[in-house]
């Protein structure tokens, strides 16, 4: 009598290959819906220094306040949204100090707050998608705060009432490049699981790193001038149902690159006093010196010749700050309007870490449709999304934009 492997057709190589092919989608992963959400408390940037120094009991630091105010006014941010106001912060003097132990209180705020904000964005994306929750097969949740077990993906699935057999993935503590990371994950999941529909959610709360000003640590002051709270969600899937699902962008290729010898350019450390932020003045130059290589690499990896003029693409770079955008724009010889969507989101919301590039996707598709352009990508077919963050890590996503329907 032969072995099971010899006699069973289920164990044949041909059968395994057939199963593999049957599990794969036919087409490319597409973004089918986008939703965004932010907390209710609005803080105009031109008066943020007054609020910040008052809320942190630091008004006696007159010269430091003047310096911080100048920093705020150079950011090209108009306003930001937070899940706290001054009255709320008065309950937590350990958070508004510079380095008092405060992680427990920060965690108590972030652990429930992050999935709750993510739920708001997810519901908007699901409503636009128009399909029942039961069609969601995978969940990718991303945040840089509220580390806990069960993790934020579990909590969000429970809040939404997703099926208990949804495949969940949690992306913790990746920082500002992670909006690109989740698109890379979603592409792989959608294309390797036929019929799958991936709910992608990024949610960020800045209270994990909020702290009072300190003359010897201006990096944190810069962080406090840039970051805002927000959440964004996508539905990603391949082979959209014609007439029912409405694809916006195709995720053609996704690649991650670590810039050599750049680990100290941007780094953050979670400590008893919360998330400590460190950023070198060299960060804009480090990114701009390496971004073109990432772009050339992704085009060549799919057998395409990189464009002779980068202005022929639509652009969704992460708005790490005004200086980073200015340097990248100059290095690639881009016209000022190419970063319109990114600069608009930076002005309206600040730097929302991983959620930012998803907000920019939403802004670009909405403006393109409102202007009657031929594609959601400002009338252009091809574009790139760029995530920059600690490491230094660059996520490069090649997108193909589709016409509005």
Curated annotation (Swiss-Prot):
Annotated spans, Disordered: 1-22
Site positions for Determines the polyketide chain length and product specificity: 209
Annotated GO biological process: flavonoid biosynthetic process; polyketide biosynthetic process
InterPro entries, per database record: Chalcone/stilbene_synt_C, Chalcone/stilbene_synt_N, Polyketide_synthase_type-III, Thiolase-like
Keyword rRNA-binding: no
Positions annotated to bind CoA: 283, 320-323
Free-text function comment from the UniProt entry: Catalyzes the iterative condensations of 8 molecules of malonyl-CoA to produce aromatic octaketides, SEK4 and SEK4b, the products of the minimal polyketide synthase for the benzoisochromanequinone actinorhodin. May be involved in the biosynthesis of the octaketide barbaloin.
Note: A.arborescens is a medicinal plant rich in aromatic polyketides, such as pharmaceutically important aloenin (hexaketide), aloesin (heptaketide) and barbaloin (octaketide).
Name this protein carries in UniProt: Octaketide synthase 3
